[in-house]
């Protein structure tokens, strides 16, 4: 997408959602690369939505991060369910900004806050159907209760941390999504950045809105 299109897209967002005031500068939401094959798609999706975004390796020192309005922890080949390790993601989760974990990032988030991820009894690769629970929370706002998503994982979250709730489930994976809305922590087992996820763009739009609201709320004051 060309720069002019990105500017138009940002203007469209401001028109569609008045709470999005990008006149004083774009939101800054970076993507931590945990080795996932689709990390660049997450970056491209954010750019498409008018966000100032960069891809950073997961060994980036937390003090070298920019002043961020939000952060995405990408998926990756790391077996978080076996090792419990994922670069410097533990330090990133200490930041007082909204964070979205995708696949391995989601699994690591669960373990960091006291939940558990382990090897999945039924690994998923390809399209799957998920069902939202109680509307799915703010990350799924404006999407239907049943939707198709793209899966690619050997491990899965089996216990959510205290303070989190399950927001989406499927027949083969109980915890397809989780959130702690008070802490602005969101996890997705599936890959919303892949075209096969029907409402992936809407999910990214919702995360951008969450970051905007956090910036205007107590966190950003």
Locations of regions flagged by a protein language model:
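Pocket-forming structural segment of enzyme catalytic cores
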Residues: 86-102, 107-202, 206-210
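Flexible gly/pro-rich beta->alpha loop and the following alpha-helix that scaffold active-site loops
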Residues: 26-32, 36-102, 106-107, 113, ...
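Active-site proximal loop and beta-alpha junction motif in alpha/beta enzyme cores
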Residues: 24-27, 188
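Short, Lys/Arg-enriched N-terminal segments with co-localized hydrophobic residues
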Residues: 12-21
């Amino acid at each position: 997408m060309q720069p002019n299109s990105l500017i138009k897209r940002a203007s469209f967002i401001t028109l569609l959602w008045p709470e999005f005031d990008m006149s004083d500068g774009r939101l800054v939401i970076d993507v931590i690369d945990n080795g996932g094959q689709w990390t660049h798609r997450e970056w491209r999706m954010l750019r498409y939505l008018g966000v100032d975004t960069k891809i950073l390796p997961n060994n980036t020192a937390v003090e070298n991060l920019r002043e961020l309005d939000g952060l995405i922890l990408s998926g990756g080949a790391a077996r978080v369910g076996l090792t419990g390790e994922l670069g410097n993601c533990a330090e990133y989760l200490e930041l007082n900004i909204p964070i979205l974990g995708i696949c391995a990032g989601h699994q690591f988030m669960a373990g960091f806050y006291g939940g558990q991820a382990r090897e999945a009894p039924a690994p998923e690769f390809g399209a799957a159907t998920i069902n939202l629970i109680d509307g799915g929370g703010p990350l799924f706002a404006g999407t239907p209760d049943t939707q198709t998503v793209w899966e690619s994982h050997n491990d899965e979250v089996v216990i959510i941390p205290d303070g989190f709730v399950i927001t989406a489930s499927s027949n083969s994976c109980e915890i397809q999504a989780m959130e702690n809305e008070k802490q602005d922590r969101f996890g997705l087992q599936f890959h919303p950045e892949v075209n096969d996820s029907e409402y992936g763009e809407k999910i990214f739009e919702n995360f951008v809105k969450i970051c905007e609201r956090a910036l205007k709320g107590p966190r950003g004051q």
